[in-house]
Amino acid sequence: MKSKIEEPSANGGEAIRFELAHLLGQLLDHRWMIVAVSVLFTLMGTLYSLFATPIYSADAMVQVEQKNANTVLNDISQMMPNAQPASAAEIEIITSRMVLGKTVADLGLDVLVQQDHFPLIGAGLSRIIGQKAQQIAVSRLKVPTLWDKRELSVEVDGPDSYTVSKDGNELFKGKVGQFEQHGDVTMLVNSIEADAGTRFTVSKLNNLQAIKMISNNLVVADMGKDTGVLGLTYSGEDPVQISRVLDQVINNYLYQNIARKSEEAEKSIQFLAQQLPDVRAKLDQAEDKLNVFRRKHDSVDMSLEAKSALDSSVSIQTQLNALTFREAEVSQLFKKDHPTYRALLEKRQTLDEQQKQLNGKISQMPQTQQEIVRLTRDVQAGQEIYMQLLNRQQELNISKASTVGDVRIIDHAETAAKPVAPKSILIVAGSLILGLVVSVGLVLMKALFHHGIDNPEQLEELGLNVYASVPLSEWQRKKDQETLLKRKLDARTDPHNRLLALGNPTDLSIEAIRSLRTSLHFAMMDAQNNILMITGASPGIGKTFVCANLATLVAKTGEKVLFIDGDMRRGYTHELLGAESKTGLSDILSGKLPFNTDLVQRGDYGFDFIARGQVPPNPSELLMNSRMKELVHWASQNYDLVLIDTPPILAVTDASIIGKLAGTSLMVARFETNTVKEVEISYKRFIQNGIDIKGIILNAVVRKSANNYGYGYDYYDYSYQQGEKS
């Protein structure tokens, strides 16, 4: 019981080790592909690092002073799990449209100028060969908003002249420093530092695009928790421009902070600026009335009682006017239910009551004294108010000018001498690693999902005998490539240049077919006849190659061999042997030509050959004709071995018809091309038709590290080395 439990575990471990070894072998087999892909990726990474535009980085530092108020509450809030650092709000302000938008307006960043280069590599190539950078400065640009692409092409004509065009159509010619306006297009070029003929693309960005361009290249980070110090980094292609942009950003941030602090004073100054002209006008009017009254009444003098009432009334009126201006300021900060606002209203009410009492006393004086008191009071009160407003205006101006914000610039923008990107070493190393990952991944994916036969044991597991494993012949592969290059074969090709058994008889593939010849000698002893059918599951697996070379090797032993090309659809054996195909099997079976030995071709290949003939419309019906049986019977009587090359069984039924006439049948499967499932289905189809498949020939075997085991492979190596020594 114990052994039964342990046995699967052992087998499972062995299977895992086999799979790992198999995958490792796949990597070794495809090592040159892995190397090639890795080198390709590395080369691409190297080229990218050479041609990529260098990116520079400027950095600056600002300090935001911490507020001392509510220290305990601030400390408690910072202890909350979702608490944001105090600098988070300042970071948002720096990257806001308020700050960045003013930067765009100050520096004219909504106008983008780019030199035209050859796509992809032009800019990098110019930089590598040391070509001087070409540039023009455009400070003003206005184009119609309805344009799909709000850009113009500018070509330099000379040191101070240029030509502007749109979509290849010239719009106007301009001069440096001159404001050019033509139709809806307005442009001002400040300077040109470029050779004649240099082209530039000048684009007009909307405000949001320009702000986003800055925001994408701007990084603001807290330099430490609760330090209040912020580090700003801005990256771009122009090292001078990025310093200017970053400096302008921090200056605008500083200005908005100061403006926020002095906002109350600014509003008060604006209010006073509106009130002073009215107060001055009322004062002038009051002085004019007093002077007119005195001239009319010959400079009337006031009594002591009138002077006392006048002084009190002026004082009260001055306080009321001051409260009026104070109320105007307070109303912008507080509501009427605020204690400060209520206190102001209560004080006004008290002064109003005092003024009423005083007016009652004045009303008891003579009419002339009343009038002189009233007029004099208006003048003196107006003078007091006017002087108070002037003094207040000066105080507010001084307060505004001396306002210091919470922000302090610690370090102004500085650009590093060396570019921060691209990082050549990292790019090349990353490209190499990526190439390795991609190539290894492709190899492993192919190994996991490709189910082609790569081991004779896979066929033996189906119960089929593997009669031979024929190695892939490099000689034959080169000849096939030459054939593909020529596209059309010469019908009279020398078989020594195409047939492996004649052209290179010491090839390892021929040694394997010799072994097959020996195996067939004993396998066919008990067969009903000497007819050998060789078929396969699919086309392009090397059936004809095996048949032709086997026929040659058997003929060399002195036996009389007949090779019949039974593939009347796509048979090409006549091309391989340099024979004729005008007449052949199809003509015999269709009765177009009476059968005689003249139809049998003979050549330097050593065996007799019947070509496929003209391609018929009904090959299967012809094979079922009695003439086929008569031909096979005649061939069996007159030859020691008859080989019939047939079409693939999974494509057509010809092989199942011919197999009924053959005493021995073999299938050919191609290494890593045919799958086990294809062979299994083909084998079952033959069994259903009552045809016994004697065995399998595994063709085009390539020795691989993934399958570096088995007697067959060692045998080929051994034979090859012995051949070299002998």
Curated annotation (Swiss-Prot):
One of its GO terms (cellular component) is plasma membrane. Keywords: ATP-binding, Cell inner membrane, Cell membrane, Exopolysaccharide synthesis, Kinase, Membrane, Nucleotide-binding, Transferase, Transmembrane, Transmembrane helix, Tyrosine-protein kinase, Virulence. It comes from the Bacteria. The chain crosses the membrane at residues 32-52, 425-445. It is a multi-pass membrane protein. Gene3D superfamilies: P-loop containing nucleotide triphosphate hydrolases. InterPro entries: AAA_dom, Bact_polysacc_biosynth/exp, GNVR, LPS_length_determ_N_term, P-loop_NTPase, Wzc-like_C. Pathway: Glycan metabolism; exopolysaccharide biosynthesis. Its EC number is 2.7.10.-. Its main location: membrane. CDD domains: BY-kinase (cd05387). One of its GO terms (biological process) is polysaccharide biosynthetic process. Belongs to the etk/wzc family. NCBIfam families: eps_fam (TIGR01007). Involved in the biosynthesis of amylovoran which functions as a virulence factor. This is Putative tyrosine-protein kinase AmsA.
